């Protein structure tokens, strides 16, 4: 199960604050009717940062590297990691993990965890398939460096690689389906 996305309208019902991590864990335990969670994921980095796999802007002239858009202040990693460590000590979770993190976020979390003698995350979950292989550049090496496992999501590319796009005869996806079908045998 994961924590980050809004679970209500309150300010403490979203993100990676210690309060939300604890509350979301309790809610998940209740919904799952269990006494512990094997792997509890931080679903995104807190603070609205877009990872390289999240929002990609190919229109580079529109990107202002010197004045990034305003983002809410992220919860400090120390607070996030302490909250997960307490849940581990309480037996409510066995392991923490990350999802949709950039390689430099993995490095931040692992270095902070190591400096405080916390277990830290044990795996990263990222989109990975034959058509989306960007994680091979930095994320997989970071996971290797810090000893994290890798759990791919969308291994069939949302149906792209499983033949689901064959049925589209017109529209936006029809051209993509044609290319996939043409190259399927390769």
Predicted regions and their residues:
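A short, structured active-site edge motif that brings together acidic residues
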Residues: 1-7, 124-127
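Flexible cofactor-recognition loop at the NAD(P)H-binding site
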Residues: 5, 34, 42, 47
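Active-site mouth loops of central-metabolism enzymes
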Residues: 5-22, 66-75
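Short, acidic/polar
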Residues: 14-32, 77, 82, 106-110
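Active-site acidic short loop of glycosyltransferases
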Residues: 34-35, 93
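Acidic/hydrophobic-patterned starts of short beta strands in beta-sheet-rich repeat architectures
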Residues: 39-40, 97
